[in-house]
Amino acid sequence: MQRIVVIGGGAAGFFGAITCAQYNPEATVLLLEKSGKLLSKVRVSGGGRCNVTHHCFVPSVLSQHYPRGGKQLKEAFRTFGAQETIDWFAQRGVQLKAEADGRMFPVTDNSETIVNCLLQEAKRVGVQIRTGAGVDRITAVSYTL
């Protein structure tokens, strides 16, 4: 059986673990978080409302709203951009709204809406979660396909 380990219990770690579990249902997906708190930055982002994405559907323009790593994000946004993010949350019952400046938040204006969605989806697809599980090294192992 294939085992996949995702390091980090933030938004990217959760989304990565969920996606791995969806596309590899036979695999065991384990998410490791060093601290005891999952999704802590999600809880405080956007003043506790959680700025999920930006209301912009052109990858090269969307990447400009991310000053750190915008250049590297262009290709990622071509694959999974704002519309895909909106759709992903909508499919899980979370509606987003755009503010005048383009920032998008859950209609509840509460980051717990996003936190709960990610936690519930991880549980639904079978992601195993361990907190207090820091990683201090990764060792390569041999394998054959």
Protein language model annotation of sequence segments:
Residues 21-46:
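Glycine-rich FAD pyrophosphate-binding loop
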Residues 12-16, 38-41:
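Short N-terminal binding/cap micro-motifs at the start of the first secondary-structure element
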Residues 49-98:
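Glycine-rich active-site loop/strand segments that organize a redox cofactor
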Residues 117, 121, 125-131:
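Active-site-proximal cofactor/substrate-binding loop regions of enzyme domains
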Residues 143-145:
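Conserved small/polar residues in nucleotide/adenosyl-binding loops
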Residues 1-12:
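Beta1/beta-strand and adjacent pyrophosphate-binding region of the FAD-binding site
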Residues 131-141:
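A conserved short coil-to-beta-strand element within the FAD-binding core of flavoproteins
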Residues 73-81, 101-120:
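Short beta-strand to alpha-helix junction loop
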